[in-house]
Amino acid sequence: MARRKNSRYSGIGGQAVLEGIMMKNSEKYAVAVRKPNGEISVELENYQGVLHGSKIKEIPFIRGIFNFIDSMILGMRVLNYSASFYEEEDNAGSAGADRTGGSGEKFVNALVTVAAIVMAVGIFVVLPYFLASLLKGYVRNESLMAIIEGAIRIFIFILYVWGISAMKDIKRLYRYHGAEHKCINCVEKGRPLTLHNVMRSSRLHRRCGTSFLFFVFFVSIILFFFIRVDSVAQKVILRILLMPVVAGISYEIIRLAGRSDNILVLILSVPGMLIQRMTTKEPDESMAEVAIAAVEAVFDWRQYLYDNFGYEVDESWMDGNESSYADQENDADGASDWLEDETADEEPQEWETEDPGEDAEEI
């Protein structure tokens, strides 16, 4: 029998936070955090995003801009929430009383988000331009200058990722990032969401935000080709003004990458997947447990497996009796071939070319 594709789009996405994971499914999101006492705290909330219900968010290339804004806002919110568990003891009481934050905290979060965007634009947009400009005396071709600028931008990003990876908290963040990907890959490959299955799933995923950032750099090289003005100020301003356009195009590419086996898309996905080797690390089982808790809070993976892979989960499989699942898998129509050895699992996943709809989550 010919081997069939065995991955399906699940609609879930998320991010790593301090000692935890945020998972989002449509408008619901859950933050699971391993508290200092070893317990797992799970907070379930709704996030409708900017311009909720507006038809503007359904327009291709425009929707990516608002998706990026939503990701920044929600990302800052859940990072602050997870950090509240590790504040100094004299602040623990007030943090526990209201971890969602009042209007004052929301205002501060908004300022921090804006400051982060400004800093990112300065480091990854403006700085590469001025560094590339130092070579103008040696390179006269504007197109080549745009390529050099893009290469410098990618180099700065890789240097940044590598540099912060030396920090203890970031090392653990990267491991939780790997746990997040493993959970999503586990269910999208049709495996029951058990600790064993999660640990043997891939830590790389094509819809990852790291891959999105690479597409941003790649698209910016192409668009910046067309900036043909003499004024330095105009060149910088045009680059900044084009960034929403770059984000919108990059979002559509990563949506396509998450559901297409087109050879060009696969090739374009490779650099982002390689960079993910730096931004994700192998988690331990305690981290995977946190990721599983976050997924289960927002996603009915048992129903998902039944709808997409055609089998019901036997609770005996959840007790570690994997042979029962193996026997069932041999007989069930549509069950995934999850018993193959994928412990290396650094290869890009197989994907169905079905349309995930407008709620596609970047992870």
PLM features: residue spans?
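Hydrophobic alpha-helical segments characteristic of transmembrane helices
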Residues: E89-G137, N141-M167
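Divalent-cation
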Residues: M1-D90
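Cytosolic regulatory modules rich in charged/polar residues
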Residues: V50-S54, Y81-K106, N330-D333
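Hydrophobic alpha-helical membrane-embedded segments
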Residues: K28, I59-Y81, E149-Y174, A247-R259
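Polar-ligand-bearing catalytic/cofactor-coordination segments
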Residues: A2-G13, V17, I21-M23, G93, ...
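Membrane-interacting alpha-helical segments
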Residues: V219, L223-D230, I237-A293
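Transmembrane alpha-helical segments and their cytosolic interface motifs
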Residues: F107-G122, S201-F226
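Juxtamembrane "helix exit" motif at the C-terminal ends of alpha-helical transmembrane segments
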Residues: Y81, F85, M119-N141, V216-A247, ...
